[in-house]
Regions:
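Cofactor-binding loop segments of dinucleotide-utilizing enzymes, especially the Rossmann-like FAD-
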Residues: 5-9, 59-62, 84, 136, ...
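Hydrophobic alpha-helical segments and helix pairs
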Residues: 109-153, 159
Length: 205
């Protein structure tokens, strides 16, 4: 089975304007949508479209979390989220006008006991499973949280895929993840130099 983890899921509220955004004024939208997401959830969505089952893990909170969970179920995604007692799953406001403006929510605090619940869900993974860690983390979690999960799974043969930036990505490298997905800039951060040409990128990879 493929398991995806999204530490900070979101409901993206997308508002479209047919005129430039005027700060401090009333702006009338010409259209709006709600998109359920977060990198790991997006991966599960693509897998579902390809006919490949997965389980979306992560954290949800409050009415927005319940709404996100129902929406994903309606899309045919299987979820097994940890439910937080406090806070709310974040809402990101995306204003699409002449220029795009984003207001991204912070997300709920994740206490240690909730993180432990997620770890327990991963304890059953074996060499037949794939774990995909993708995206940013809330400020309440330590920067070594990805490393902590891979260390817990070390030696079990679980194929781990990591799509993250900076310390989140660098800290997992000693555990030899099956696949990492840095872009050019993120790869440059790992090797400690700027990469400009295809040859430089290939050598760094």
């Amino acid at each position: 089975m493929i398991y995806t983890v999204t530490f900070n899921p979101a409901i993206d509220y997308v508002v479209r304007l047919d005129a430039p955004l005027e700060v401090g004024q009333v702006n009338r939208a010409c259209g709006e949508d709600c998109v359920l997401g977060g990198k790991g959830i997006n991966v599960s969505g693509v897998l579902a479209q390809l006919g490949c089952p997965s389980v979306a893990l992560g954290f949800v909170a409050g009415e927005t979390g319940a709404w996100l969970e129902r929406g994903l179920a309606a899309q045919g995604l299987h979820t097994d989220f940890v439910h937080l007692e406090n806070g709310m799953t974040r809402i990101n406001v995306k204003i699409k006008a002449a220029q795009e403006t984003e207001l991204n929510g912070a997300g709920p605090d994740i206490p240690d006991e909730a993180l432990h619940q997620l770890e327990e869900k991963l304890d059953s993974l074996t060499e037949n499973d794939v774990l995909i860690l993708a995206g940013s983390i809330p400020a309440s979690l330590p920067q070594d949280v990805y490393e902590r999960l891979l260390a817990r799974l070390d030696g079990r043969g679980v194929r781990c895929v990591v799509d993250a930036t900076r310390a989140l990505l660098v800290n997992v490298l000693p555990y030899h993840p099956f696949l990492i997905k840095p872009n050019n800039h993120e790869l440059g951060e790992i090797v400690g130099r700027e990469l400009h040409t295809d040859e430089e990128i290939a050598a760094a990879a």
